[in-house]
Amino acid sequence: MRAVVQRVKRASVAVDGNAVGEIDKGLCILLGVANDDTEEDANYLCEKIVNLRIFEDETSKFNLSLKDIDGEVLVVSNFTVMGDARKGRRPNFMFAADKEKAERLYNYFVERLKGLAKKVECGIFQAHMEVEIVNDGPVTILLDSKKVF
């Protein structure tokens, strides 16, 4: 399971021009599910994300986590995060999970996160979405449950 985690001042997601999720200060997560992922991968990423110290304290050091600041989360499913572009010019998505597995683990991830964060909003799985992000920093962290980077 792979996540692109962005620290935001605010973020929103819309489908067909209608807002389906929006947050204030917190994290926007683009989440991709791999074909060999399990609930353990989701658990690992959820814990890692809410405890990741990427918010500044009063001395401007990265010392505070999402939990510390009582921040909000926007989760957007994004299979392209699993793309492999090492060879050729077109990304290969052979490592992305099939629709059923990806949706099940995405929903599990969101529900697990709801137990760990103040507010969790999300997009609509497999929909074409418009995501608006006001980055804070910018601070962008790449996480992979298999720790490939």
From Swiss-Prot:
Residue positions of motif Gly-cisPro motif, important for rejection of L-amino acids: 137-138
Species for this entry: Caldicellulosiruptor saccharolyticus (strain ATCC 43494 / DSM 8903 / Tp8T 6331)
Subunit structure: Homodimer.
PANTHER family referenced in this protein's UniProt entry, alphabetically: D-AMINOACYL-TRNA DEACYLASE 1 (PTHR10472:SF5), D-TYROSYL-TRNA TYR DEACYLASE (PTHR10472)
Gene3D superfamilies in alphabetical order: D-tyrosyl-tRNA(Tyr) deacylase
One of the Pfam families matching this protein, by short name: Tyr_Deacylase
Biological process per Gene Ontology, one example term: D-amino acid catabolic process
Family: Belongs to the DTD family.
Protein name: D-aminoacyl-tRNA deacylase
Biological role: An aminoacyl-tRNA editing enzyme that deacylates mischarged D-aminoacyl-tRNAs. Also deacylates mischarged glycyl-tRNA(Ala), protecting cells against glycine mischarging by AlaRS. Acts via tRNA-based rather than protein-based catalysis; rejects L-amino acids rather than detecting D-amino acids in the active site. By recycling D-aminoacyl-tRNA to D-amino acids and free tRNA molecules, this enzyme counteracts the toxicity associated with the formation of D-aminoacyl-tRNA entities in vivo and helps enforce protein L-homochirality.
Main location: cytoplasm
Source organism superkingdom: Bacteria
Swiss-Prot/TrEMBL domain comment: A Gly-cisPro motif from one monomer fits into the active site of the other monomer to allow specific chiral rejection of L-amino acids.
InterPro entries noted in UniProt: Daa-tRNA_deacyls_DTD, DTD-like_sf
Gene Ontology cellular component list: cytoplasm
Enzyme Commission number(s) from the entry: 3.1.1.96
Keyword annotations from UniProtKB, A to Z: Cytoplasm, Hydrolase, RNA-binding, tRNA-binding
GO molecular function annotation: D-tyrosyl-tRNA(Tyr) deacylase activity; Gly-tRNA(Ala) deacylase activity; Ser(Gly)-tRNA(Ala) hydrolase activity; tRNA binding
Subcellular location field: Cytoplasm
Gene this protein is translated from: dtd
Catalysed reactions, as listed in the record: glycyl-tRNA(Ala) + H2O = tRNA(Ala) + glycine + H(+); a D-aminoacyl-tRNA + H2O = a tRNA + a D-alpha-amino acid + H(+)
